[in-house]
Regions:
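N-terminal pre-catalytic "stem/leader" segment of glycosyltransferase-like enzymes
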Residues: 1-70, 387
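Conserved donor-binding/catalytic core segment of Leloir-type glycosyltransferases
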Residues: 11, 162-183, 189-192, 204-206
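Extended catalytic core of nucleotide-activated donor transferases of GT-like folds
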Residues: 11-13, 44-131
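Acidic anion/phosphate-binding donor-loop and adjacent secondary structure
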Residues: 104-105, 144-164
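Nucleotide-activated donor-binding/catalytic signature segment of Leloir-type glycosyltransferases, i.e.
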Residues: 212-246, 250
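Aromatic "clamp/platform" in nucleotide-sugar-dependent glycosyltransferases that forms part
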Residues: 267
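Short hydrophobic beta-strand element within catalytic cores of glycosyltransferases
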Residues: 275, 284-287, 301-305
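A charged, aromatic-enriched C-terminal amphipathic alpha-helix characteristic of glycosyltransferases
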Residues: 328-336, 345-376
Length: 387
């Protein structure tokens, strides 16, 4: 127990030493909760992803948050089946899902948690569709760093597949993803092949996160099969730059600055950190009309692609099948996506409003941390615990 006048305390458990968006939002919430005056103990969830930040790219501040604090709750950034029971402390799980409904096992595990927090209304609805009690789930959007990601940042120097500098192309379309079925990278490249020609002054930049040589081999096998089925090759379209380069966090603003547009053809998103970073950087946006995108995008700030629900197909990806079996996700309309690309390449995609201004007004990290603090304070009060 502690005196009521002491500052709030919280234990956070989540992966924070890696390169994933999950690691990023664990770090940002920790950073901004601390700035709100909350004393933190940070415990790493080391098994979230194999790829970690190099030692010299890690902020040593996070490594200092190991001392115990007199917390009454543990906030765990992970999937529900990865939550570790916290004894007498309140158990809070911040998680997200990209298809409907969430797995039945998640709902069963979630019933043992004191609170589930998700970033978007779409994730909340997916939990409710699975039968989760509505009074045990709250929504707290993630944030965007509009100071670090902004117009005017010097672009990274990148070269296209033929050696021409990326900066020489008038239209530079970026996609950042880990190639898995939900991200629909094969569909994205297929749409590029059908929408563009070598005469277009445009390039597609695909920043890949490949965890192994086998993953790379499988991706390019699937791309080769797609080209064979389509009857059209990469050589018959505007150039595509695939890069698996490991960018330090300090380099990421320059990567966005190297692009003019950001494009996703994802089948479902819990948030899509790269899309929000691209919006903060001032890029023009093309996104499917579904899930998390509808939290911070609309027709005024982006080209939105119509999408239809379909059964989630995770063929050949056992780990994804375990999550998405029995769920539905979205199939973006590739013809509409091709038309959106043509609007971008032909210069007919001027947005009516600024996505960056929208993020700066409503979706910054200080705002996200303040919302989360309020949710946690309410939970402690409901259970008669000091925060």
């Amino acid at each position: 127990m502690r005196a009521a006048q002491e500052p709030p305390s919280l234990v956070i458990r989540g992966s924070f030493r890696g390169l994933t968006g999950h690691d990023h939002h664990t770090r940002e919430f920790a950073r901004h909760l601390a700035r709100q005056g909350i004393r933190l103990q940070l415990a790493d969830f080391a098994n979230w992803h194999l790829v970690k930040l190099p030692d010299d790219a890690r902020d040593p501040w996070f490594e200092q948050l190991t001392a115990p604090v007199p917390a009454e709750a543990v906030l765990q950034f992970c999937m529900p089946h990865q939550v570790v029971a916290s004894g007498s402390r309140l158990t809070v799980n911040y998680t997200m899902f990209e298809a409907c409904p969430v797995p039945a096992g998640w709902v069963a595990r979630g019933r043992s948690h004191d609170l589930v927090i998700v970033p978007t209304e779409s994730s909340r609805q997916f939990w409710l569709a699975g039968g989760y009690p509505p009074d045990r789930i709250r929504t707290c959007p993630l944030g965007a760093d509009v100071d670090r990601f902004r117009p005017g940042v010097p672009p990274l120097a990148l070269a296209g597949p033929a050696g021409r500098p990326v900066s020489d192309y008038r239209v530079r379309v970026l996609n950042v993803c880990e190639p898995q079925p939900r991200k629909n990278l094969v569909g994205l490249v297929r749409t590029w092949l059908t929408a563009t020609s070598p005469d277009d002054d445009a390039i597609l930049i695909v920043k890949l996160s490949l965890s192994s040589r086998a993953a790379a081999t499988d991706l390019f096998r699937r791309l080769a099969l797609m080209q064979q089925s389509l009857g059209r090759s990469l050589a018959q379209a505007a150039p595509v730059l695939f890069t698996n380069r490991l960018f330090a966090e300090a380099e990421m603003p320059g990567l966005y600055a190297a692009a003019s547009h950001y494009w996703s053809l994802s089948r479902g998103e819990g948030w899509d950190l790269p899309m929000t970073e691209a919006a903060a950087a001032g890029l023009r946006l093309i996104a499917p009309r579904h899930t998390a995108y509808l939290t911070y995008l609309d027709d005024d700030v982006a080209q939105l692609i119509p999408s239809r629900l379909e059964p989630a197909d995770t063929s050949g990806t056992p780990w994804a099948a375990a999550l998405f079996d029995g769920s539905q996700w979205w199939a973006p309309d590739e013809d509409a996506a091709a038309q959106a690309l043509r609007h971008a390449i032909d210069g007919h995609d001027q947005p009516r409003a600024s996505a960056r201004d929208r993020l700066a007004a409503s979706f910054t990290w200080p705002q996200a941390a303040a919302r989360l603090t309020g949710i946690l304070a309410d939970l402690h009060a409901e259970h008669g615990r000091p925060f």
